[in-house]
């Protein structure tokens, strides 16, 4: 059994005389683009303040003036006009955190003794650990859990291999496999740097569906070697979740593993995104009163996520889709040796449109962006059909400013938690694997993906459904179980 390690809340537990530094990659991916205070950049400061109550108020004022958001303030000690206080506040990025510290140190009678970044504190020693399901407290326990008693269980599996699902962790365990080549918005950062993300993924599996997942970060980019390694470790796992492997290698790796293994293989960057997009679109089209088979859909980005989104939408009945990359529409005259792009060309863009993304938006009903930030303006969205649906999913900066899009679009969704209608893969993968493991499934089909999307969409009732609530929140406990149930019924 795997267990999420409890977080370390306050500086009282762990002190640093200087803050743990954020990497330049993290700043580039998040810090310089996030302008509002965020829990991603929560800091806790221990401060000496001279001058009594008014001085403490001045400290609070200074933090507010520098646009940080105070979460908590606790008096640690107070004696002879000197207070020691712990202040926890959200900042916008690493530079903003340092500005807050510098501003406090510049005040008369104020000294920042120590400060820490709570995100880094949460990660000290990792976020997950192994825990025992059965205690081993004496020789009797030991003789059953290990030698000699375990030999009987080994031979039972040897004689009846199907019993591995009943008698080992395989029945509830998933490998989260990456080579670290396409990590979030950070790109090719390697397997070691990818590990915190994979730990986080494993924690989400456990938190939302009680699935025991474990990171497997591979120090190779060779397609054949990755396939070989995953096949070799597969006997331990009931499923394989491929994560953050760059395109186009991810397509071949998934396809080959699905063909050669007898357990489900799921590339979340492709299909997890596609499931949640379809779920959100099902409900968004209800809001605007349109049918999937009738609407014209523009998809910006035809990599792993875009490819899977297009395939799943077609499987659900969409008939009018055009895919776009940085060079414009994918059309019959633009075929290459990339089989996945060519498949999109052969199955979409029936009118063979050859223009740019901005041109393709004119008169479109739906925009789905899985590409790059700030490539469109509110004026571009205004050229879409009435009752437009806009899913701007690039992170951390959407393809178009959500507020600008909302001036003319009927429904707007992003991949971010600070806007309504967050399209987040965590709505899909925990429940999906819960259902697959429960059913001891060996494959994942398009019908299963569609069923998962329908299950997510169904959590939002007709009474709740509106333009700012088309998709349930990630902490809605109904989501995972409903998805799991849909998968069990499909298997």
Show where each model-derived region lies.
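Rossmann-like adenosine-cofactor binding region
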Residues: 342-411, 416-420
